[in-house]
Amino acid sequence: MRKRVYSLLLWGTLLVSFLFPGCGRGIETEAETKESVTESVQKKIYQVCEPEKEKIPEADALQYINGEYIPYGYESLTEDQQKLYRQLLNGILEYKDIVTVDACTEADINLVNNMVFVDHPEFFWLDQQSYTFQGDGSADGAGSVDLQLVYNIDKAEIESTKAGIEASADQWIAQVPADADTYGKIKYIYEFLSQNTAYDQSCPNNQNIQSVFLNQVTVCAGFSKATQYLLGRMGIFCTLITGKAAPNDEEHAWNLVKIGENYYYVDTTWANPGFSETQEGVVVQEISYTYLCCDASTLLATHTPDDLLPLPETVDDSYNYYKMNGTWYSYYDENEIYHILTNSIWEGKEREDFKFADAESYQQAVAAMVNGDLIERAVREAYQFGEGETYQWNIGYSDEDKLLTVYW
């Protein structure tokens, strides 16, 4: 919760005047001299009452580990707001308790504060900010704005904790294939985090990256910030997006990435689709690729971004995992699915994905493959049973993803 304490800063102006009555040219010359003295005295008094303000220190908002990072939140601000951002950034980097920035409105400082944390997932040691306004709270008012930073960790522990996080990050990044392109690196991080980090709303520090890199347990905030942190260390553009998500319109966080000239959405939290129960029990899906480099039409079916950031157009679906791997279906064709299932068994595959473009086609597939006997018929045709032999399979399915996965 932000704490706002308003104080009124009163400035006194001391006015000195010299009255010298008279007329005529000779007296006018004398008056001019006295007016000059008056101006000099007033100027000296003004300098005593209003000393020149010290320049508030600023950090370089464009500086990052590899010099290729683009602070998306910073770039979205006005010039005056960017200055506030740099002032706040400097205070955070110096571990200050109170950071002073130029006079501004409450709306400005709220926005700037949010943009700093949108751009910097590495600031794990801060939870929230409380504000103390000195002045009238307007952008052109006298005085300044003080932000009191709230730490979630003892300052003496920040550097050692940071070192632990960086060590884990470097170890994980070292496992990324050396020949991976930008998409390959994003895909690896997406898979790695989803397979090595559990989701638990009760875990400590779940709103920052400590939970991921030190404990491997987190929630959406940790997943999205860890994704941003790792990709940023590899020189890949990635920013944080917040909003709400289905099915209960809950607060959620995900990412926006850039490959070449195009933008895509990534939601590492939803890499596990939470498959429904099947005839064999609850199936745990290894990973869903629905939200790996997806376009807006895919994401907006389940996600609603807030208006904190201006978002670019995201219409390209060149990196749709299921299209790239030939498991995307624009309609349901039972004969086609039947032959794919039999071929999958003959080829000895471990799994077969079926990702559908629309809900109607997906529901037809569920009716045939989950509730019907389509898979059983395919197994009977493709598998040569010996005496007493059985053949088992599992199927997982997600209504939100419109995805079915058969495990042989």
Positions of the model-derived regions?
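Bacterial N-terminal signal peptides that target proteins for export
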Residues: 1-9
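C-terminal motif of bacterial Sec signal peptides marking the signal peptidase cleavage site
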Residues: 19-22
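N-terminal accessory/pre-domain segments preceding catalytic cores
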Residues: 24-178, 298-408
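Conserved active-site-adjacent core of cysteine acyl-enzyme catalytic domains
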Residues: 156, 204-213, 218, 222-229
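Secondary-structure boundary elements
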Residues: 157-212
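Hydrophobic/aromatic-rich core segments of domains that either
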Residues: 222-297
